[in-house]
C-alpha cells in the first residue's frame, strides 16, 4: 500500500486543529496505519487534543507486542488515548473541553479495518465512491430519524455538532468496519473541512483525474479552499496494491 497525507489550515481559521498520520510501513503488529483527527476546544486545546491522541495511539500500537488482531489494536489504542486525553483536559483550565474526532484504518491481507469516533470519514474509491464510516453527529441522527434530508445537512445550523469524541467520556464509543479490497482501490480519510466544502461526486472525479495520490490530495485541498475553506482541511489518500 502507498499513501500520501496533507493538512491545510483553510481560509477562515487562525489555527490548524487537525492532525494526520500515514505510515505505509508496519507500526507494531499492524502492517500500515492511517489516521485523521479533527480537534476541538478553545485556545490551543483542539490542536493539542488531535496531536496528542494520534501520538498516544501510535505509541500504544508500537509497544503492544501480544495483540495482533487489527480491530483489537485500534480499539485498545483509542480507549488508551481517550483516558489520557481526559486526564490532560482535567489538568489545566485551558484544556477544558478538549477532544477530537478519530478515523483510523489499517489494511492487512486484502482487508480494510476502520475505527471511527466523530465525523471524520473514510471513503472507499474505486469506480465510484462509498462512505464507509457513519458520522456521529446531530445531523446524521436527524437524517436517520427522517427529520431532514441528507441534501440539507450541509446547510443545517447544527452541522458541526458531533455526538461522540475522544477525550469526553469513559468509555468512548467506537464504531468498526471491515471491507474486502481489490487491487487499485483507494482509501480517503478526511476531516469535515473537506466534506463540508466538496461534494462526494466531485471528490471522486478529482481523484480519478489525478495522476498520483499527491496530486489528488492537493487538488482536494485546493477545491475545498476554492469553495470557501471554512475549516481546516485534512486528507490521507492511500492505494491498495
Give, region by region, the residue ranges found by the protein language model.
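PP2C/PPM-type serine/threonine phosphatase catalytic domain
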Residues: 1-241
